[in-house]
Regions:
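Mid-to-C-terminal alpha-helical segments outside catalytic/metal-binding sites
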Residues: 4, 8, 14, 28, ...
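N-terminal carbohydrate-binding/catalytic regions of secreted carbohydrate-active enzymes
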Residues: 47-87
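Active-site beta-loop-alpha junctions enriched in small/polar residues
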Residues: 48, 72-73, 95-101, 133-136, ...
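A general structural detector for well-ordered alpha-helical segments in enzyme core domains, enriched
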Residues: 55-58, 79-83, 114-121, 154-158, ...
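Active-site gating/metal-coordination segments in enzymes
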Residues: 74-168, 225
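Catalytic pocket-lining loop regions of alpha/beta-barrel enzymes
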Residues: 145-259
Length: 307
């Protein structure tokens, strides 16, 4: 898939980091020809697929060769799977996450019928993973808080299905449930767990969890944004552009354990372009010898698409 760059700064329509990226792309030398910063191919680990057409355009413009997709506010397991059938670069994950109004009561009463639904979805062989499962998610605009134990019957059932079908699981678990998440990882050492946004943990907790749990993968979606709407502490950037050297050091020490993502949700072309531009800027700061693993290799291996 050949990436298409914005032809003018106004095409990107985004402030901050995305505009800086576009400005760099469009810098003109004396002979009048544009200098184009090469787009780094990457596999996006985190997309809420609300608009498949917008997603396809964004992937082409910003170098995403593949994307893990699951539902958003305007989609479902069925619509995600339909899109993936027509766009083979999309990697569908099945979700029964409790933020869904229809599913939350089942989580509250530990209803095994919901696990049977997930089992039926996975038995089709069409899905390459499970998630995003927001077991413990702080409240946000339009998103009610969820707070279910990673050791509870529902998460345990999900992990057992992941083991049965040999699939990775993406979980959103905040640091308030860190001990239970650690215990879950120990209980299912053979199940790869993708930690969405790395639980927004600080550096020392990221290092500790990765050292103690070899089946844990730290996913960086929303951590590379210049600003995060929930907390300025959630970004790993020290000034909106440069990654903290300590974070780069950890990522390059453990390159097989990190994934990149956009957390795209297709609210607007401008907001999504910011997210994709932030991934490109982050990847440029990683040394080339380890960049390919973080950008693509780790995720494609987890979902069975590695060459």
């Amino acid at each position: 898939m050949k990436p298409l760059l914005p032809s003018r700064a106004s095409d990107a329509g985004v402030p901050g980091l995305a505009c800086l990226f576009v400005a760099a792309v469009l810098a003109l030398p004396a002979h009048g020809q544009p200098v184009v910063d090469a787009v780094i191919p990457f596999a996006d680990a985190h997309v809420h697929l609300n608009d498949p057409a917008m997603q396809r355009d964004l992937m082409q413009r910003w170098g995403a060769t593949h994307a893990v997709v699951f539902w958003g506010g305007r989609s479902s397991n069925e619509s995600v799977l339909d899109a993936a059938r027509s766009q083979p670069e999309l990697i569908p994950f099945a979700s029964i996450s409790p933020e869904r109004t229809a599913y939350r009561p089942a989580w509250e009463r530990d209803d095994p019928a919901l696990l049977h639904q997930l089992d039926a979805l996975l038995a089709s062989g069409a899905f390459r993973g499970i998630g995003e499962i927001a077991a413990a998610h702080f409240p946000a605009a339009g998103f009610a808080e969820t707070d279910f134990s990673p050791l509870g019957p529902m998460m345990t059932g999900i992990m057992e299905l992941a083991r049965k079908y040999r699939l990775p699981v993406m979980v959103h678990v905040e640091s308030t449930r860190l001990q239970e998440l650690a215990a879950m990882l120990l209980r299912f050492p053979d199940v790869p767990v993708i930690w969405a946004h790395g639980g927004y943990t600080p550096l020392f907790l990221a290092r500790r969890m990765l050292q103690q749990h070899p089946n844990l993968y730290y996913e960086l979606s929303a951590r590379t944004w210049p600003r995060h709407p929930r907390s300025p502490d959630y970004t790993i950037l020290r000034d909106g552009v440069e990654v903290w050297p300590e974070w780069l050091q950890l990522i390059e020490q453990m390159p097989g354990r990190f994934l990149v993502g956009t957390d795209a949700s297709h609210r607007s072309p401008a907001s999504e372009a910011m997210k994709f531009a932030s991934v490109q800027d982050f990847l440029r700061q990683i040394r080339p010898p380890v960049r390919e693993q973080v950008a693509r290799g780790n995720l494609l291996r987890l979902v069975g698409l590695a060459p």
